[in-house]
Design a protein with these regions (language model features):
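Conserved ATP-binding subdomain of kinase catalytic cores across diverse folds
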Residues: 1-70
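Conserved kinase catalytic-core segment
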Residues: 18, 82-148
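ATP-dependent phospho-/nucleotidyl transfer catalytic cores
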Residues: 47-108
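Primarily interfacial, aromatic-capped hydrophobic alpha-helices that serve as membrane anchors
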Residues: 148-156
């Protein structure tokens, strides 16, 4: 632990060189954080929410619509491919976003390429505008990639 901020920065800078549009991911900067007389390297980004918009995580979206946890529902589905299909189908059904499957493909490709092992239903989301219309959210939270947590599995 401790390198997540740097990883966010590096991954976002590498995504600048990809075929993704700038609005498809969050661009991070490094930030020095002083805490209890120690300095830590963190990160920050511009607020990607337009005025009056909200970030709705998939867990919150599903719970708000079905009054049931998405996590609990997913664990009743044995196959990973069926879980992904369920996530895409339900998100498109609830939000009306028609290309959520393509969005999920981008997230999973980024996570695979950068070895991000911390993708979950609280860091995948959609945006809701002031008129309660849903939009794709920029991809964020790639900080567990690039072996940033290697010391947890292999203490040095």
């Amino acid at each position: 632990m401790g390198y997540e901020g740097l990883v966010e920065y590096v991954v976002s800078r590498l995504l600048e060189k990809s075929s993704l549009k700038q609005e498809e991911y969050v661009l991070y900067k490094t930030e020095e954080i002083n805490y209890k007389r120690r300095k830590y390297l963190g990160c920050k980004s511009e607020n990607f929410l337009p005025e009056g918009w909200q970030l709705i995580t998939l867990e919150r979206l599903f719970y708000g619509f079905y009054n049931e946890s998405l996590y609990k529902k997913l664990f009743t589905i044995p196959e990973h491919s069926e879980r992904l299909e369920f996530i895409v189908d339900q998100t498109e059904r609830i939000t009306g976003i028609s290309d959520f499957g393509k969005y999920m493909s981008k997230i999973l490709a980024i996570d695979t390429f950068f070895m991000n092992e911390d993708r979950h239903m609280h860091n995948i989301g959609v945006l809701m505008d002031a008129e309660e219309k849903y939009h794709l959210c920029p991809i964020f939270d790639n900080g567990a990639g690039l072996l940033s947590d290697i010391q947890m599995d292999y203490p040095m």
